[in-house]
């Protein structure tokens, strides 16, 4: 799709592959065929193992599912730290990218919920706060700020909890045109009772 008449897509793709190879060598990788085009399909080919954060993330989630106790928590912690947000944002309108992003986001959210519960029970409120702050930055409309406020309240950081409430309320009003929901309002009442 998107090719003008008379343009050979394979020739253009070969040019892109050639330029990529040159860029990889300039970046310090050994000179070899990194991308191979066979029957119109590109595949990665290198003499050394290559690991991506997305693959490593899904492996950690799978290993967590097969584990229990401290091992499970360790895999969830690693997975959570590997997750940095949307996969291939430049291609976010491609159907396969949308589907994969939804899968990865779901895995991430489940990991955050389970880790958050573990950290709360363990009394690791600072780490729990870091966890929810990251989740809230990645997905500001998924209500992670509620857990962030709860952590701040446990840490007796009432002013900071109020600031999170105020900033979240402003974000929801400006971006979505809706006021904060009942869960957020109940947090405001709890904050006000402590200030």
Place the predicted regions along the sequence by residue:
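Tandem amphipathic alpha-helical repeat scaffolds
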Residues: 117, 150-154
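Intrinsically disordered, low-complexity protein-interaction/activation regions
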Residues: 1-130, 134-143, 160, 173-175, ...
